């Protein structure tokens, strides 16, 4: 039996008040129907999608009040591991192709449902009025402290790839394998605080516990008064930052649940949703 994601266990899980809390998996489908409960879908999203997906869920549920959307938001690597370990999931929205590729290799993606949705951009940020000497990636060594996601986190991998591109790190087959300690050494021993996901990187900079950090452009939405963007890192250095979405095979889902997951995926990839993504600083011009 697949494990359920409970808000009390995973702090990153977002359950909308209009959707209620995740129920006990031991509850039978018949009892759910009898009690009038909504059709629930489990949607695993990269942490950087938290804000925009909150907006999209609210929009979707205006026309689909019978569907309950439960989000689990974390780094794409963590979400992949959870799915592989048996956590119940209907849709996976990753911040990188690597994790989705692995899920397909595992045979856990529903054939024909994978779609590229948005592109993002890695940026170097600092808190307003920090008076940092850092101007961008080239001068990261001048920082007093850096918030950096681990290599298994997409933004951490993209940052490492960019540092390789500008000659700050040695070229390796997979940038994700470069440790935080190796990055620190390459940057002259600068203090680096490794973070589990991009949201924690952002928080570390906004709260002032780290002088600078690398995050996504979309993460600055709502923080314009708190942050200064020191550099928008060129795609030539990182490659495209594509976010794919797909249905995940869920043997315990009934027909209504599978239909709801399919319909929500269509909504997320619709022209209506593109306008919302654009407003949250994502690039929807992807193939």
Placement of each model-derived feature along the sequence:
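Short, high-confidence coil segments that cap the C-terminus of an alpha-helix
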Residues: 66, 88-89, 210
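Exported/periplasmic ABC-transporter solute-binding proteins
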Residues: 22-58, 62, 77, 97, ...
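Positively charged n-region of N-terminal signal peptides that target proteins for export
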Residues: 1-12
